[in-house]
A protein has these predicted regions:
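A general, composition-driven signal for non-globular sequence regions
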Residues: 4-5, 22, 144
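Generic detector of well-ordered alpha-helical segments enriched in charged/polar residues
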Residues: 37, 41, 122-125, 174
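Generic alpha-helix signal with a bias toward terminal, lower-confidence helices
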Residues: 15, 50-52, 56, 95, ...
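Amphipathic alpha-helical interaction segments
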Residues: 52, 72-73, 136, 141, ...
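Short, Lys/Arg-rich N-terminal segment immediately upstream of the first membrane anchor
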Residues: 1-9
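N-terminal leader/targeting segments
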Residues: 10-15, 19-99, 106-107
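Long, charged/polar, surface-exposed segments that mediate recognition or autoinhibition
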Residues: 89-160
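Long, continuous compositionally biased terminal/linker segments
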Residues: 58-61, 66-96, 148-204
């Protein structure tokens, strides 16, 4: 083997090793994001053992809620209707007699600009559509869209928007967006997203 061939072979090995290392690092970084992995109706302790985010135990015989000890994303693990949210700072998991009965969260770690807000809600809606969720009450509360009409509605502090989705008769999601006065950025339009997940509480 000539010197040039040896140099080229070694260079190829180095490039391959660096590529593999970078891939591993990216996967590790993504998997290091704390998450709460659950499905409505399951034992609370099963969620605790499965989740990478730390969260306290349920209170036997009580209906209450718990909060993760760090920012965390929700991974809803129903085999058909599953979805994943961005990291959340406000995140509560409701339980009744040690069974999970609902989630209420804001899938963001700070108030967002309108463009970023729409990216989050449209991504969630797209996940739901692909998984077979169906928007309900669309005449009164249509799904969010990136249109001039929707942007004007969200900018109106007296309006905002709400969208409801059903997964057959198993689950319901409510998604709410409204303007938020952010004292850290008083000159910017910022928005809060609220997501509620439980068994259906309204009719289609």
């Amino acid at each position: 083997m000539s010197l040039m061939h040896r140099v080229g072979w070694r260079r190829g090995v180095v490039v391959l090793a660096v590529t593999v290392l970078l891939t591993v690092v990216v996967i590790q970084l993504l998997s290091d994001e704390p998450e709460i992995a659950l499905v409505i109706g399951e034992p609370y302790e099963a969620m605790r053992q499965r989740s990478s985010a730390s969260i306290g135990p349920a209170i036997p015989g009580h209906a209450w809620f718990s909060i993760p000890e760090s920012d965390a994303r929700l991974r809803f693990i129903d085999p058909k209707y599953g979805f994943v949210t961005p990291l959340a700072r406000f995140f509560t998991i409701g339980f009744d007699d040690e069974l999970i009965d609902g989630v209420r969260m804001s899938p963001q770690i700070e108030p967002l600009l309108l463009d970023d807000t729409l990216k989050v809600v449209l991504n969630l809606q797209e996940q739901w559509r692909k998984a077979g969720w169906t928007p309900i009450r669309v005449n009164e509360d249509p799904p969010f869209a990136d249109t001039p009409e929707w942007r004007a509605r969200l900018r109106d502090v007296s309006k905002g928007g709400t969208s409801y989705w059903h997964a057959e008769d198993k689950y319901q999601v409510m998604l709410v967006v409204h303007r938020f006065k952010d004292n850290k950025r008083p000159t910017e339009e910022r928005y809060l997203i609220t997501l509620a997940l439980a068994t259906p509480w309204t009719n289609p």
